[in-house]
Amino acid sequence: MNIKIIVIGKIRNEFIKAGVNEYLKRLLPFINIKIEFLPSFSELSEKIALLKEEEIILKNLRNGEFIITLDKDGEKISSEEFSKKLFKLPISQNSQITFIIGGIYGVSEKIKQSSNFILSLSSMTFTHEFALLILLEQIYRALKIQRNEPYHY
């Protein structure tokens, strides 16, 4: 399985970097996973920032990717449902799943419309850094559920 995670903004908190690195270390033996950090335009107005971020996100998408965008208004599913969805996607060995984590303003409507699925991690709002860490933990949990290994109780 190939997973790409597009994140607007970079990680500034060392404890989150440590958590991200820990989950990448756990996942890499089983999943080809990479994270692409794209620039944030949070210093601009919301409208302009969303347009600029939309442009760079779209440039980083390829045909054939199954796109899952994280958004607080997306579908809320359990860890078990996430595992089923992730490992039952109709993708070939050469294609990939791409997750998109927006910046301070989220993602544009065009990005949402370009997505195959919109996922909510919670009704609460998280920084892009926390969203990345939570997503990686949920991908790891999904893998453990799929492999019927202890971790998820």
Curated annotation (Swiss-Prot):
The keyword Transferase is assigned to this record: yes
EC number: 2.1.1.177
SUPFAM superfamilies: alpha/beta knot
Cited Pfam families: SPOUT_MTase (PF02590)
Gene Ontology terms: cellular component: cytoplasm
Superkingdom, taxonomy of origin: Bacteria
Sequence positions that bind S-adenosyl-L-methionine: 70, 102, 121-126
Keyword terms: Cytoplasm, Methyltransferase, rRNA processing, S-adenosyl-L-methionine, Transferase
GO function term, MF aspect, one: rRNA (pseudouridine-N3-)-methyltransferase activity
InterPro entries with a match to the protein in the record: Alpha/beta_knot_MTases, RlmH-like, tRNA_m1G_MTases_N
Catalysed reactions listed for this entry: pseudouridine(1915) in 23S rRNA + S-adenosyl-L-methionine = N(3)-methylpseudouridine(1915) in 23S rRNA + S-adenosyl-L-homocysteine + H(+)
HAMAP family cross-referenced by the UniProt entry: 23SrRNA_methyltr_H
The protein's assembly and partners: Homodimer.
Entry function: Specifically methylates the pseudouridine at position 1915 (m3Psi1915) in 23S rRNA.
Protein name, as recorded: Ribosomal RNA large subunit methyltransferase H
Lineage, broadest ranks: Bacteria, Pseudomonadati, Dictyoglomota, Dictyoglomia, Dictyoglomales
Gene coding for it: rlmH
